[in-house]
Every structure is written in structure tokens, then in C-alpha cells.
Amino acid sequence: VAFELARFLRRRHQPLPRLLLVSGARAPQFRRGHVPPPEPSDAEFVEALRRLEGTPPEVLEDPELLRIILPALREDAAIYRHYIYAEEPPLDCPIRAYGGTADPNVRPEHLEAWALQTNAAFGMELFPGGHFYLQTYRQEFLAALARDLTE
């Protein structure tokens, strides 16, 4: 969302962000030619959440709680599932990418590819853990974020 907002601002000749931060996200060019997959069933969607290890198991095992939160989680996932990348020139703002070393869906090369989306500086930092590395390495991430925002 932040990447497309920066591109939208550029098309409108508005100031770009001083720094674009992305976390746990493949570079958008990996979506080139993407065809959105069919909507998963509730059971398939919950199993995908379980594999990402970011939602507590007790939440995923509580039918009443799932009934409340599943629609919002599905909408969030739909934004990504239906995103189609369109080629444009690289941005003129720096990009900093963060990710987890054990993320099964976003490998280091997916993060490194963000460098192709900028004419300015690019940096990347990996933290131990999977897609939700922030849950375990919150302090380390916040220290890196503070450093990057003050450079």
C-alpha cells in the first residue's frame, strides 16, 4: 500500500516520502502477470494463518472469535491477493526493507529486489524469525527503525 501511495504521489507531482519502509513484503515486480487465485474456504484461510504463526492458536481454535475477526482478516489478505503490479520507473526516494530470516513466503531475494524500485539508496535488514518476526524481536526492530528514521 505504501509503495503504491508513493507512486500515486509521484504521478500527481506531489512530494515523495523521505523514506519508504517495507516489512515482510515481496518486491512488487514479483506480482508481474499475477492472476488472483480463487478465494480460499474459511478452513483453508485459517490453515494459512496457522502456517504464518502470527495468530495465537487459541484465537484460531475459537469459533466465536473467528466469526468476528475472520471478515477483517480476509479483507486484509484480499488487498494482497488481488494486487497486480504495473511497470513504472523507479521511485526517487530511498527504500528500506525488513524481513524475517525464516519467513516461508518472503525470502531475502524477495526483499533485495526492492532495490530495483528506487533510484535512491536501498537498505535491507533481516531479523531472526518468520513472517511475524516483530512479535519476538520487537526491540531489535524498533532500534533499527529508529536508526533508519534518524539517518
Regions found by a protein language model. Name each.
Residues 97-99:
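Short beta-strand/loop motif that positions the catalytic acidic residue
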Residues 129-139:
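Catalytic histidine-centered segment of alpha/beta-hydrolase-like enzymes
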Residues 3, 7-47:
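Flexible "cap/lid" loop of the alpha/beta hydrolase fold
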Residues 89-95, 118-121:
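Short, proline-enriched alpha-helix->beta-strand connector loops that line the catalytic pocket
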Residues 107-116:
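Short alpha-helix in the alpha/beta-hydrolase fold that links the catalytic acid
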Residues 70-88:
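Active-site nucleophile elbow and catalytic-triad environment of alpha/beta-hydrolase enzymes
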Residues 102-106, 132:
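Acidic catalytic loop of the alpha/beta-hydrolase fold
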